[in-house]
Amino acid sequence: MLGEVLRERNYIVTPLDIHAGQYDDSVTPVIYNGQKIPFADKSFDTGILLTILHHTNNQEEIISEAARVCRQLIIMEDIYSTQLQKYYTFFLDSFVNMFYSPCPHTNRPDKDWKNLFFKLNLNLEAVYYKKLLGVKQVVYVLKGEK
């Protein structure tokens, strides 16, 4: 849906996925091997990673590779600050994604995401917080190397 909204506003959208399945007839993602995104450095103005990182075991590599091909990153994830929030987030995510592949639930607290961005030498330009169904969500806006 986000891609459709962006295309209606004349943005060029290039979906990327590790699976060849189409989301609908208007979207055909570029398939990649989960390691090397098949585009040159800084090929895109903005990359959006929308609630996908907690479904992976190699977040650092994915973010690094996305930062390589994009001048700016927008990352949205579910975060937690207590054990109760952590397990509630895992439960809700498992329910919402029950028909998809198993999820390793590699969600992080806000502080851990920020530490990872610092480690990857990314500039944190803005942060937005919201709650949805009791789950804390965050959007990070990042620019390439400091």
Residue ranges of model-derived segments:
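Class I SAM-dependent methyltransferase SAM/SAH-binding core
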Residues: 1-36
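C-terminal alpha-helical "lid/dimerization" subdomain adjacent to the S-adenosyl-L-methionine
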Residues: 2-4, 16, 76-139
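Short conserved loop adjoining the S-adenosyl-L-methionine
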Residues: 36-41, 57
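Local beta-strand N-terminus motif with an aromatic residue
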Residues: 44-45
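A conserved beta-strand element that flanks and buttresses the S-adenosyl-L-methionine
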Residues: 48
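A short His-aromatic
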Residues: 51-55
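A short glycine-rich, Lys/Arg-flanked "PGG" loop and its adjoining helix->strand segment in the class I
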Residues: 60-75
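C-terminal lobe and adjacent flexible extensions of AdoMet/dcAdoMet transferase-like proteins
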Residues: 140-146
